[in-house]
């Protein structure tokens, strides 16, 4: 049934996306048209009408008049429209041409705003590619098929990714990001799905483990025979009482009864020190031997109290993460509990339903989907160890989001390079846009979206960058074809032959030559930094061991990174990257630049061999090459 509903929805969406193919004729909208609103418009209707008027003003060169009465040539907004939305899902919309006029309305909190942005994108070709790049062509008129009738239901109730542009309000509105953890959208703008009291890893604070560690060590997890503040004991009734008290305190202070959904995160700390005490072990053994059993039981009891207190629009959120990833047996989450399944151990060069590398996760996904009414996902989309390198997951982004939707997932957060202001190389803006569009519609024409982005962001050279991205995707994964989020730089892509590497270099040169503005050239060079980092890590092209100028090329790469504003090479660099020992820069691969000193034994060995390779090529160059490949 789920698959059937999915296919029907996709078919309806596609019909709405390409109505021209089925139109007998078009209606023509120009600057003489008016925007029709109700006599007493709501704040949401006023916002929607103003947004539409402002953008149409940019299109036509004259802002259309907003009126409360019109007989013809109008776009009706909200309650002024005649569309029937009774069968439209919450936060969905309907855009329909009726008697030659356009009628736009939506449901629940966000539907109307989503509808206006969809109208602008679909019929005015408005695209918000980044927080700084919005494309809105000027036209004398807009053509809309006379039989247009677009009905849309959101694929997910909560969507989020970070990077840089997704933090921007207008970007979030245009591209359908709804989670409130990284953005603030006022109620009239559609609002957000808000986490109250913290987004993740909250259980230590809620259970006050530091406060009670000395007076009540039994509140702490017993792990490997020792009590630790890493996690609390989830079968201790006093711990449950403390946590419940603090959840209720958060709700007393921050709850909004008018919000459609608010979430309190009761999520395990970021470690694997789950409690192994006798009570926890017995409970887990009684539920399939799964550590998630104590987690689900714990949050279920909190959720019951929250519901009893009348917080009907509140859900309690918890993780299925590392030790709690697999679903338990004989216990199910309450209907006001969110299970947030994390894909942290997955391979990202293959779709998540690939048995060879992701079979365990996919089983966990389907198991949770069977027992959980509100399944959320925490997904990943960058190399957190070496973020400056290429992370070629481009071919799985859309497929994975489709897999989540088809397995009853209700909310999705794709964690990316959230520290992009400190480490902006690679294809951060492109990947953020790809993710956002797929969250908005997992079945969109992603190739067309990527082409449009590349043209806008990289300029005329965008077509060459797109070819490069496609080549990187084909090389995704190490020698075993896997790609994980803590891989060494060179292992993120299978080796390029010298011919292939030179071809990629040539495409970068063509892209730079085609650029028409300094901004386009800067965007190209910034993305190219990731390719240069990968080549330096894999000893390719100008970074070959057989090139005596290899140290100078690495020095140039390092200086270009600093000039581009890069002050971190990964999630946790741990040192001042502007003050790295010059010897490391010149004679070690970039993956060793994290350490910032020569104390690392492997780094010392590599530097010695590289110095010999520079002094005595080509013999030691060959030795250095094989040493690096073996020990990378």
Give the predicted meaning of each segment.
Residues 231-241, 249, 359-463:
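Structured mid-domain segments that build the active-site/substrate or prosthetic-cofactor binding neighborhood
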Residues 299-326, 375-382, 412-415:
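Aromatic-lined carbohydrate-recognition surfaces of secreted/lumenal glycan-active proteins
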Residues 43, 48-51, 55, 59, ...:
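Feature activates predominantly on carbohydrate-active enzymes
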Residues 435-630:
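Catalytic domains of carbohydrate-active enzymes that cleave complex glycans
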Residues 10-99, 130, 134-149:
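Acidic, contiguous N-terminal accessory segments
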Residues 317-345, 389-393, 422-431:
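Substrate-binding cleft/loops of secretory-pathway carbohydrate-active enzymes
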Residues 272, 278-316, 331-337, 343-347, ...:
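Active-site neighborhood of glycoside hydrolase catalytic domains
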Residues 327-334, 341-383:
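Glycoside hydrolase catalytic-domain groove-lining segments
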């Amino acid at each position: 049934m789920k698959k059937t509903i999915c296919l029907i929805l996709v078919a309806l969406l596609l019909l709405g996306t390409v109505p021209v193919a089925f139109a007998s004729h078009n209606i023509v909208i120009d600057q003489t048209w008016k925007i029709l609103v109700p006599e007493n418009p709501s704040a949401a209707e006023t916002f929607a009408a103003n947004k539409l008027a402002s953008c149409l003003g940019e299109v036509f060169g004259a802002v259309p008049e907003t009126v409360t009465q019109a007989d013809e040539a109008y776009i009706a907004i909200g309650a002024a429209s005649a569309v029937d939305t009774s069968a439209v899902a919450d936060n969905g919309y309907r855009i329909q041409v009726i008697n030659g006029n356009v009628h736009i309305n939506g449901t629940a909190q966000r539907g109307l705003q989503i509808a206006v942005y969809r109208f602008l994108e679909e019929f005015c070709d408005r695209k918000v590619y980044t927080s700084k790049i919005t494309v809105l062509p000027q036209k004398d008129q807009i053509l809309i098929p006379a039989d247009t009738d677009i009905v849309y239901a959101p694929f997910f109730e909560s969507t989020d990714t970070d990077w840089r542009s997704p933090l921007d309000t207008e970007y979030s509105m245009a591209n359908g990001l709804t989670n409130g953890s990284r953005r603030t959208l006022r109620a009239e703008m559609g609002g957000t799905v808000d986490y109250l009291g913290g987004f993740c890893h909250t259980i230590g604070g809620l259970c006050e483990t530091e406060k009670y560690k000395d007076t009540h060590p039994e509140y702490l997890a017993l792990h490997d025979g020792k009590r630790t503040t890493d996690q609390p004991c989830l079968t201790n009734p006093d711990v449950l009482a403390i946590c419940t008290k603090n959840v209720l305190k958060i709700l007393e202070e921050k709850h909004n009864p008018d919000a459609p959904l608010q979430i309190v995160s009761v999520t395990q700390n970021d470690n694997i020190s789950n409690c192994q005490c006798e009570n926890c072990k017995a409970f887990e053994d009684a539920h399939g031997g799964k550590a998630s059993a104590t987690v689900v039981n714990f949050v279920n009891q909190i959720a019951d109290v929250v519901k009893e207190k009348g917080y009907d629009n509140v859900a309690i959120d918890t993780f299925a993460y590392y030790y709690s990833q697999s679903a338990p047996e004989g216990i199910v989450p309450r209907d006001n509990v969110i299970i947030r399944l994390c894909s942290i151990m997955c391979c990202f060069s293959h779709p998540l339903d690939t048995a060879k590398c992701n079979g365990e996760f996919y089983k966990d996904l389907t198991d949770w989907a069977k027992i959980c009414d509100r399944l959320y996902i925490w997904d990943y989309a960058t190399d957190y160890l070496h973020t400056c390198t290429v992370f070629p997951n481009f071919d799985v982004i859309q497929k994975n989001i489709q897999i989540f939707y088809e397995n009853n997932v209700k909310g999705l957060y794709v964690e990316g390079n959230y520290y992009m202001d400190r480490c902006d190389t690679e294809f951060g803006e492109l990947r953020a846009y790809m993710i956002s569009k797929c969250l908005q519609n997992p079945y969109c024409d992603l190739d067309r979206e990527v082409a449009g982005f590349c043209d806008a962001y990289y300029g005329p050279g965008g077509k060459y960058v797109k070819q490069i991205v496609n080549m990187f995707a084909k090389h995704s994964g190490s020698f075993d074809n896997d790609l994980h989020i803590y891989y060494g730089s060179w292992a993120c892509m299978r080796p390029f032959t010298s011919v292939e590497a030179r071809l990629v270099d040539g495409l970068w040169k063509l892209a730079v030559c085609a650029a028409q503005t300094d901004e386009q050239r800067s965007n190209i060079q910034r993305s190219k930094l990731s390719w240069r980092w990968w080549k330096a890590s894999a000893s390719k092209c100008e970074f070959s061991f057989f090139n005596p100028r290899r140290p100078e090329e690495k020095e140039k790469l390092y200086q270009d990174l600093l000039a581009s504003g890069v002050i971190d090479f990964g999630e946790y660099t741990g040192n001042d990257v502007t003050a790295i020992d010059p010897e490391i820069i010149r004679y070690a691969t970039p993956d060793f630049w994290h350490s910032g000193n020569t104390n690392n034994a492997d780094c010392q060995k590599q530097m010695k061999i590289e110095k010999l390779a520079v002094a005595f090529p080509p013999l030691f160059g060959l030795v250095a090459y094989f040493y690096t490949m073996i020990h990378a």
